[in-house]
């Protein structure tokens, strides 16, 4: 297999998601390469059931929902809290839905950690990107950012658990930091930079 056959040369890519926060991040990441973003919604493709046991498996399930006549990318990501055995992890979005929203989910996670005998607020954000070409070949790239959860959540930037998470060596949550900076330094961007190094080097 020659990686030169898997360079992104076209100027349009489908993001396999209905999550507007993710779509906006991908828009920023791909804007440098002047690549237009389409979404599952644009193609009238419903969200798929995430039956995988890992971020990578779910990311692949999502990207496979896009027909091969489109270049496609998918992200599966989540918050992993160390003392909670890496929960909510791959269930991050579903956990929030079950709790009645992101704020309720953050409140419950913080409460679960706080009531431990020796509370440890260490956490990480994880992202796995899957890139699928027209022949069905899929490449996956992972990104992680270590940090901690904090209470109360702060800031209105970003989405999901962003106001709840402070990266290592930082004092602001992802909800407080300037959005343009966050997008270029978060877990998704770590994975994207690995992808770009391989597939976008000629752009």
Where are these regions (language model features)?
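Anionic-ligand binding patches
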Residues: 2-14, 21-203
